[in-house]
C-alpha cells in the first residue's frame, strides 16, 4: 500500500467512521494497523517540524489512532508485575518482547512503566515508572520521570527531562486538534501540566507547578507582552498571577522571568550516568 493510498484509505474510513467496527476487515483494518506500526517504530510521527520551525500535524495518523479504538475489541493485556493483567483495546508496546527486543530498542524501561503500542521511544531514553500513551513520541536521551504521563500523540524532543508527576496532554479526550509539543533540550518541572496543543520551544525551562493551556496567559516580565499557546525558545517560566485592575481576584498566569543562562543550565542539566 503506497503512502498516498494509505492516507486516502484512512481519511475515507474516518469520514465513514460510524460504519467502522470490530467486524471491519480488509483494507481499512490493514491501513490502520500499518499506520500504528509506523508510529510504533518511529518511521512516522503525528507531527513534524519544518526547517522554518513550523510544526505540521499529520491528521491522518491521528485519525488512524482514533479508528483503532473502533476496530479493536477489548482483550486481556499481559505483562504486569506479579502476573497482573489489564482489560483494554490497546496492547502494551512490550507485548512479546524479550531481551533481544529491548536491547535493539536501546532505551531503559523501569518497572512498572507502561507504554501503549503505537508510541515510539527513541534509543537512550529513560522511562521511570511512568505512562506513555499511543501515538506519542519520546526523543533520544529524554527521561520521563516517576508518575509523569505523556499523552496520546504528544511529541517530546531529545534530551528533555519531564519531571516527576508532570502531565503532557493528549489529543483523544477531550478531542484536540493539535498535540502538545515539547522541543529538544527542555526541562519541565515536577507536577507541571502542558495541555491543549501548547508548544514549548527548544531549551525552555518550566519551574515546578507551571500549568499552561491554550488560554493561559504567558507574560514576559521584561516586556510585559502577553502571548498564548507557545513558550518561546530558551525561556525560564514560573507560576504567577495577574492582578485584576478592578480589584477582584488575581488570575493565574505563566511568567517568563528570564532567558536560560549558565546558572539555569547547571541546575537543570541531564545526567549522562543515568542513560
From Swiss-Prot:
Enzyme Commission number, as recorded: 2.3.1.117
One term of GO molecular function:
2,3,4,5-tetrahydropyridine-2,6-dicarboxylate N-succinyltransferase activity
Q: Which Pfam families match?
A: Hexapep, Hexapep_2, THDPS_N_2
Catalysed conversion reaction:
(S)-2,3,4,5-tetrahydrodipicolinate + succinyl-CoA + H2O = (S)-2-succinylamino-6-oxoheptanedioate + CoA
Alphabetical UniProt keywords: Acyltransferase, Amino-acid biosynthesis, Cytoplasm, Diaminopimelate biosynthesis, Lysine biosynthesis, Repeat, Transferase
The entry's substrate-binding residues are: 108, 145
* Location(s), subcellular: Cytoplasm
Read off the CDD domains from this record. Answer: LbH_THP_succinylT
The answer to whether keyword Lipid biosynthesis applies is no
Q: Name one GO biological process term.
A: diaminopimelate biosynthetic process
Which NCBIfam families does this chain map to? dapD, PRK11830.1
UniProt protein name: 2,3,4,5-tetrahydropyridine-2,6-dicarboxylate N-succinyltransferase
Gene (UniProt) = dapD
